[in-house]
């Protein structure tokens, strides 16, 4: 298996074979994200991808049960190529149960509902959509490249195709001020409308080399404190009414790991936040937070 540059995956894909289909992110304009800044986006040649599958078959002995398609936006590939990759994977790994990928909202919207359903039928079982926020104001500010309406359409299109929809939201993305509350309430509203199966809340980290980091250094962006980040998380939980949704905030960026099913576990998780805010439960120290 061959890889170009640093490889990222969701925490839940730690057991997966990571197959790099694209290099970098086709959007790569988000002001907060430093993951792919060192990569010029391109799609790997199909010949190399299929060779990697055969190499992985030999390495794993055909016994792999999960595969994750890297980098940030494999769904942008041509439909026929994606189907070929999926078919080769399920042929190479007879025990394969699911193939997953990140799904950029703009790239997702280039696929019709029928095309996404076809990908699901060929074994694309899960998509991770970086929603980050439901606020148009914040989406524009961080150069996400889509409107809230387009983000909602991308998520609904994936879910309605039968693909298991996992979304990521970013606590603290709006910084301090009036936009903070709008960010959280609009995000909760989008979750209620999008109806994902899983929501992963991550906490903003200012990454050197990103425009948001530069804005912070120049005094144009004021980040929230750890306590304010937890207050945002609590507000989010209190305003998600659709269920059942599996909710986690166990990513290394978070100050307090949480896990539960909404809305059944809302009270338990908000109580855990209150305990941390009162100083009764320790929060993850800054030096232990990571991407």
Where are these regions (language model features)?
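Conserved strand-turn element in the central/C-terminal portion of the radical SAM core barrel
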Residues: 106, 134-138, 159-183, 202-208, ...
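Catalytic cores of alpha/beta
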Residues: 114-116, 175-193
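Conserved, mostly hydrophobic/aromatic
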Residues: 25, 33, 49, 69, ...
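Conserved SAM/AdoMet-binding glycine-rich loop
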Residues: 57-160, 241-242
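Canonical Radical SAM [4Fe-4S] cluster-binding loop centered on the CxxxCxxC motif
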Residues: 5-51
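Non-cysteine beta-strand/loop elements that form the S-adenosyl-L-methionine
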Residues: 22, 116-134, 163, 169, ...
């Amino acid at each position: 298996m061959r890889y170009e540059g640093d490889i990222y995956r969701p925490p839940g894909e730690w057991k997966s074979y990571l197959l790099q289909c694209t290099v970098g992110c086709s959007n790569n304009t988000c002001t907060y994200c430093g993951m792919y800044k060192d990569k010029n986006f391109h799609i790997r040649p199909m010949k190399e991808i299929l060779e990697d599958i055969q190499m992985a078959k030999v390495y794993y002995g055909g016994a792999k049960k999960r595969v994750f398609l890297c980098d940030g936006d494999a769904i942008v590939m041509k439909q026929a190529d994606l189907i070929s990759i999926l078919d080769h994977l399920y042929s190479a790994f007879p025990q394969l149960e699911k193939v997953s990928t990140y799904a950029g909202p703009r790239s997702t919207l280039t696929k019709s509902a029928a095309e996404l359903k076809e990908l699901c039928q060929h074994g694309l079982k899960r998509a991770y959509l970086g929603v980050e926020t439901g606020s148009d104001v914040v989406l524009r500010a961080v150069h996400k490249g889509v409107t809230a309406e387009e983000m909602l359409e991308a998520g609904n299109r994936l879910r309605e195709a039968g693909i298991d929809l996992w979304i990521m939201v970013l606590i603290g993305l709006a910084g301090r001020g009036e936009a903070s509350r709008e960010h959280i309430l609009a995000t909760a509203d989008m979750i209620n409308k999008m109806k994902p199966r899983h929501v992963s809340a991550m906490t903003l980290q200012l990454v050197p080399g990103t425009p948001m980091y530069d804005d912070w250094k120049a005094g144009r962006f004021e980040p929230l404190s750890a306590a304010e980040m937890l207050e945002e998380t609590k507000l989010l939980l209190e305003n998600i009414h659709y269920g059942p949704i599996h909710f986690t905030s166990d990513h290394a960026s978070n100050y307090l790991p949480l896990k539960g099913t909404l809305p059944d576990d809302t009270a338990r998780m908000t109580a855990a936040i209150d305990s941390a805010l009162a100083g009764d439960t320790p929060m993850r120290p800054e030096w232990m937070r990571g991407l």
